[in-house]
């Protein structure tokens, strides 16, 4: 079962996304939630790094739910969550 025990997240300026990690047993999976997805979740958000990280923190439960759905659909090295995933 996918869990998110590590509350760490980091802004990836190349992808314009926030990266976070999920764990299933001993395996770790990378997830990226796009800037556009975060803007959908937090419409008043500005598009700077601090605002993106804050939007992630405020929407953590919805993001984790979308990540679990993506993980359930297929197993791969990393997952990108777009606005359509919410």
Q: Residue ranges of each PLM-predicted region?
A:
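A broad, structure-centric signal for solvent-exposed, well-ordered loop/edge residues
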Residues: 8-11, 27, 40, 45-48, ...
